[in-house]
Amino acid sequence: NDAEAICEAVARPNMRFVPVKTGEQQAVLSVHRARQGFVKARTAQANQIRGLLAEFGIVIPKGIGHIAKRLPEILEDGENALPGMMRQLVRELGEHLKVVDQQVKEMERQIKLWHRDSEPSRKLEAIGGIGPITASAYVASVGDAKSFKPSLSRHSTHG
């Protein structure tokens, strides 16, 4: 049973234990998860706007920036095929997209603030190709990397 297995595991001399995350680490990881959810919602909203406009023959390239740039001109263009109801819908969806985009930016602001105050996270960022988002997520998930003695044990923890 489970209790027996736990007792056996504790008694083994070569058993390694994963350190418990601090409240701060859990909070940073929660902000990362929230950011990821907002990014997913933003992408879904952008794709919905693109898809609805495509049904009226209006094509917007991929990228949030393209939508932000093109939406005002599309809504003001009285010669396109958009009925009034559709214009209002697209306007509201565009406003919702702006709100979700602001939520993503706020999560990124919080992550960057934490990153700025975290020496291990800043050290990771010094490695080429690693930015504040990746560095802070890694430091928050791993914590003290010294608890992993050989590099192979760290690798097996993170796939």
Feature roles, as predicted:
Residues 1-159:
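A detector of single, family-specific signature residues
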